[in-house]
């Protein structure tokens, strides 16, 4: 492996900018002048065991606005991993900060407590908004983390960290600058040259911030990876948890759909929602899933993903929702909803009642999460009484991992509901909920 900084950031690069960054007037500074090129640039490498099987932690959008939100991250996510994870390294999938680039370093110090090498991806909230071209927009990021795109191997897997933040003049009439998803020809050439050295039967994992399906020049990347039998891409950005399978409907020409994961975010819904007993907002995402991170496991060319909810038992993998009390005449008309956080179209989800009935398949639906809607409405009423007590939750979004099934007709009494699920990786989980039925 390469050397690590005191914050466990891999030191695999040398920055040569004799006059420093072109960042005159930037709010956040870039690279200081490096002076003349040294006589040699040396990269020590240290031997380490890299077995066929290994794991990595994935953080989407920690996105702290200030030190208080860095503390939220520390208490809600980091502390549970310190001394307890068997991951070989971790990756933050962009939006390391929320425009305030002074939070980079305190967040680095927090994540460093996990005790493993930590790679970083550039996000749209990690750039210098003062820049007037893409090349200079990454100067502060580059000073702390190094290049915005690069590659590395761990064990049998090849990783490509990509920069898909295209900083551009959005409106020439007003002079307004903004971003869109884009790799650019220079980076696509780098990817082409990099992959030319990677055997066809090696798993390639591409990590970026904006989801691949939203990147303007994604078809150029498709052409570079679609003939490879083993590839995976991972992003964040949307503050949801999603699995996408890219096909010819989006211009993919490979023999099999390409799996793209949109990872859960550490900050959830930007630290919105009422605080818990620790003073930390619940931060439920707009798809009804909690904030948290993921653990990805590799075994040669195979991989699997595990959702790690923040501040909860790691075995909590779903929410089951229905009213607390129903009349007997209502039961057969009442749906049970199961929000399976890491679920996809390839998951099986089934339900049974009172541990004696048969398991019945639940229907995968594209709806908003009803518990998110109720929570949002309730909190909005409280905020009307006490404005500014916490940040208002976002609008609900369509959940891609929601299932439902109506209850059968039930007699009065307390009834136990079980939901079981098996995901595309063969991982099984069980959820429980009870309902009280009263006579009409």
Give the label of every model feature segment.
Residues 254-343, 347-350, 402, 406-407, ...:
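Binuclear metal-dependent phosphoesterase catalytic core
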Residues 10-20, 24-25, 424-440:
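Short beta-strand elements
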Residues 35, 407-413:
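Surface-exposed, short loops/turns at beta-strand junctions within beta-sandwich domains
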Residues 19-104, 193, 439:
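N-terminal active-site segment of His-dependent metallophosphoesterases
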Residues 194-214:
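Short acidic, glycine-rich surface-loop motifs adjacent to enzyme active sites
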Residues 61, 94-95, 123-124, 209, ...:
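Active-site glycine-centered loops adjacent to acidic/histidine catalytic or metal-binding residues
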Residues 12-33, 101-200, 218-234, 238-299, ...:
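Extended active-site neighborhood of metal-dependent phosphoesterases/phosphodiesterases
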Residues 116, 368-406:
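Aromatic sugar-binding surface patches on proteins
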